[in-house]
Amino acid sequence: MRSSLGIFLLLLALSGTTAHAQTTPRKAALGSPTPPTAVPVPKPLTKDELYQTVAQLDTEMFAAFNAHDVNKLMAYFADNVEFYHDKGGLTNFTQTKEAFARLFAQSPDITRTLVPGSLEVYPVKNYGAMHIATQRFCHVENGREDCGNSKFVMVWQQQAGTWRITRVVSYDH
């Protein structure tokens, strides 16, 4: 018993702490690293706040699309984005950027609008949000306006107050 107390006091002296200040588990006092401090998770947005946030992101992102500003548009996508398109297949960030640049070059008058009443927003716990809607693309072809609707699901990740798209599923073209 006496040797255990002696070892404890020796370890305590070597660790530079006092018995009153010792708040970490015994394992930490024996040389194990202390666990990292948890980063506080921001308070989740209310359902209405989340909806308004994603609706605003949709408006801003597609303003960049309609302006054919590829760099500004791609700022909304995470570097590790996976874009699944029913006609074009799976693309990564670079391929998606190249596809938008080609689209804007081939159809310089293309525009996108959100179909009114189609926007749905759902929280993704400890991650961000799902953004589901129907969109309408229009451009002039052979002297006439050509429009078509498609559907999409976007998964937005929120990190340090910044929202980025990590997954896109675009379908029903």
What kind of feature is each model-predicted range?
Residues 127-161:
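Exposed beta-sheet edge and beta->alpha loop/turn motif
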Residues 22-79:
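Short, low-complexity N-terminal intrinsically disordered segments enriched in polar/charged residues
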Residues 6-16:
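Bacterial N-terminal signal peptides
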Residues 84, 138-140, 171:
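A generic structural motif
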Residues 1-5, 21-22:
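Positively charged n-region of N-terminal signal peptides that target proteins for export
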Residues 48, 52-53, 70-127, 136, ...:
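A solvent-exposed, acidic/Ser-Thr-rich amphipathic alpha-helical stretch
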Residues 22-35, 149-173:
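Short beta-strand edge/turn micro-motifs at domain boundaries
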Residues 83, 131, 165-167:
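Short hydrophobic/aromatic-rich beta-strand segments that constitute the beta-sheet cores
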